Amino acid sequence: MTVPKFKKFKIEAYKPGKSNIAKIRNIIKLSANESALGVSPRVKKILQNKKLLISKYPDGKAKNLRKEISKKFKCDFERIICGAGSDEIIQMICQLYLKPSDEVIVPQYSFLMYRIYAQIVGAKVVFSKEKNFKVSINEIIKKVTRKTKLVFIANPNNPTGTYLTRAELIDLRKKLNKNILLVLDDAYFEYMKNKDYKSGLDLFKNKDNVVVIRTFSKIYGLASLRVGWGHGPKKIISAMNLIRPPFNVNQVAQMAAIEALKDRKFINNSVKHNIREANKVRNALQKLKILSNEVTANFLLLNFDRCKFSANYIFNKLQSKGIILRSTEDGYNIKNKLRLTIGSTKENMRFITTIKAIFN
């Protein structure tokens, strides 16, 4: 048989954090930055609703969800687009803006899907160097050419946990050419409580050359339902709607997201839990000479440079005990580091107890 020829991509496929380990039960997955507290009780109630019309197509425009987003975040309904996870928003932006001769700038250590979607449409990905794992505005500006169309930044950044301040983001937008679209990923903004931080949406909701993307996969706990959203100028959102799949966000995801937005108590509890537990984990690890970033999201980047064991050794030892962390060598190319998701109180205690036992 002859297989018709298809395009060949010179890309490294995204590798999600492991979920299973052969022959081991009671696994703790601390590799994917998922919600430590699960989902809101309001969401659970929706998921138990037997009247869901799953035989019918969902609202393709996600009107009710967009209205709820508009209400909660005080932004224009017409400037909102919903996607099957924020991944799909990233994909649509790349499809809309990039062609093979174009360039997109992404920080050296950043969410892998920025580069993957850009490469799929044939654009050249240009990496800006980071300083001490922090995005550098000067390094981004150095990489700008006439071919630059997009700049992607996650703030706080995944997997490093560092962030740009309010003043730094404003400075970056001023220094970039006006015809370059700045895409700010607010995936972890709910966890960030530093006074010098401001979310991309709060800073640029009325700008014509900024698109902000957000997700329901992290603090809202809807990772499996795949729902995210973007906010930008009406012209850009209208153009994205032309290439958006007609029923891209399913009915259950839309209804769950609406209820998740309404539950302030769950969000507040999640933030408090994260700060308390992350600091507890940091303090325990410091005694083992494992350093990490300050708490800016629901994960920590663990640094083993001063530790008597390597990151790879600890990764394998923990895995043999049923605890999965994220290696930063795969895809990110960050040596001797591990990314740790902040889990439930019980999960974090087991992690601390297990890693202490490895050292003893």
UniProtKB/Swiss-Prot annotation:
Subunit structure as annotated in this protein's UniProt entry: Homodimer.
SUPFAM superfamilies: PLP-dependent transferases
BP terms from Gene Ontology: L-histidine biosynthetic process
Keywords assigned: Amino-acid biosynthesis, Aminotransferase, Histidine biosynthesis, Pyridoxal phosphate, Transferase
Glycoprotein recorded as keyword: no
CDD domains xref list: AAT_like (cd00609)
Any one Gene Ontology molecular-function term assigned to this protein's record: pyridoxal phosphate binding
Pfam families: Aminotran_1_2
EC identifiers of the protein: 2.6.1.9
Protein name per its UniProtKB record: Histidinol-phosphate aminotransferase
Cofactor(s) essential for the protein: pyridoxal 5'-phosphate
